[in-house]
Structure formats: C-alpha cells, structure tokens
Amino acid sequence: MIHPLIQRLTTTLGYPLLDADGLDRQVRTQPFSVLFFAGDPQRFPEALDVAVILPELVKAFPQLAPALIAGADEARLQGRYGFSVWPSLVFLAGERYLGCLSRVLDWGEYLERIPAILAGENEDLPRIPVLSPESGTPSCSPMETSES
C-alpha cells in the first residue's frame, strides 16, 4: 500500500506515476522534469518529507514537470541515473540527465542548487565505483587496470 503522503502526489496533485515503459514518453514532451524516486517509506522515512517538499519545489520552479516513479520500476530505473541514496529527485531536460538531489535538504539548499542544476551543462551520469579484481581498490571504470 502506498503511503497517503506519496499517494496524494498522484491522486490529488495529478502527478503522473511512471513505470519504465512510460518514462521516456513522458519526459520527452517536457522541457524540464523532476522524477521522484521515493523508495519504501518504511525503509527511507525521508521519502515522506520529500513528498511534502516536492509540491513546494514545483511552485518555486514552475518550469519543472514532476512525476513519481512507480515502486516496481524504481530499482531498474535507479540504475539508469546512477544514484545510490534514497529518496532522490532526478532532474532532466527532455531525456537528458541534469543532476540529482538525494535525501532531504534545507529549503535554502534546494533554492540554491536547483537553479544551478537547471542552468548547467548536462552532467555525466554518476559513476558507481567498481572494485578491481586484482587489487580490490575502487575504480570508476572496469576498463582501468591496476599496475603491479
């Protein structure tokens, strides 16, 4: 069962609930999108705070088209955007990744960081470190080799 604060985003505020199949169609039609990856609110209670903050962010940044990512597809889509902390807000220009804000921030941080994300050049997707089998040290690319 979806928590009422998260359900309110779709039922009362009309935010689309996107699955993996509908995501690309939706964001392709929007100049700027913010995707809410809530995760399980029992595991990540900050998701409920972000569910309350998100509508206020949309008021402050009306160019953002908000959407909630369906729980069944969150893990698969998380891999596309490379974040590792829940809850997360992923910002897109069309289908292009712009940035991500994870967990709950102070209101002033949102007001400072979102314009920078929207105005900036597209960020590369974050790289998830891969452990090198030879040395056990983190590497951002499986193509890198450790020197002996």
Swiss-Prot record:
Residues 128-148 are annotated as: Disordered. Residues 134-148 have a biased composition (Polar residues). InterPro entries: NiFe-hyd_mat_HyaE (IPR010893), Thioredoxin-like_sf (IPR036249). Coiled coil: none annotated. Pfam families: HyaE. CDD domains: HyaE. It comes from the Bacteria. Belongs to the HupG/HyaE family. This is Hydrogenase expression/formation protein HoxO. The lineage of its organism: Bacteria, Pseudomonadati, Pseudomonadota, Gammaproteobacteria, Pseudomonadales.
